[in-house]
Amino acid sequence: MMNRVEEEKGNELGEGHTFIYQKYIDYLEENKFVDYPRMVQLAVAALRKKSPAVTVLISRFHHILIDEYQDINLSQKQMIDGLLTKQSNMWVVGDDDQAIYGWRGSDISFLLNFEREYAFTERFTLTINYRSGDLIIGASSRLAKNLQSRFEKNFSGDRQVKGEIRF
């Protein structure tokens, strides 16, 4: 298994932050505490062993639903893959324009490559935003077009809004 600090720190932590994070990991281990990322890692390790108990557990999951798929990290992806069987049905929701957890190791490529990785995938793109009007949707769409890795899409709001946006 990958060193926890290396796996979770993402690409943006400097040496000072890495030192502090290592102290945090040491504290957890000394006190026999388990945080959420460690729970995921332990689940991945158990799933890889394929013990009879794990096999029975996995057989109970026929449908897997994942929200905010654009924000999963490598450990979470490994856990998801470990839960899948040939009979599994997986339904994910993700928005490549809203990937915000790169600082903690999330990887947008898992969403962008989803259709290549999982057979029989069908994508539905929701193009009408019922939360915001055309003014905000237009501005955010122009901004999102500058993102390096994203699906091409066109959005519209469900109502006309007058005004102006100032930065």
What is each residue range found by the language model?
Residues 1-61, 88, 108, 164:
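A basic/glycine-biased coupling hinge at the interface between accessory DNA-binding modules
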Residues 35, 67, 136:
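Residue-level signature of catalytic and energy-coupling elements of molecular machines
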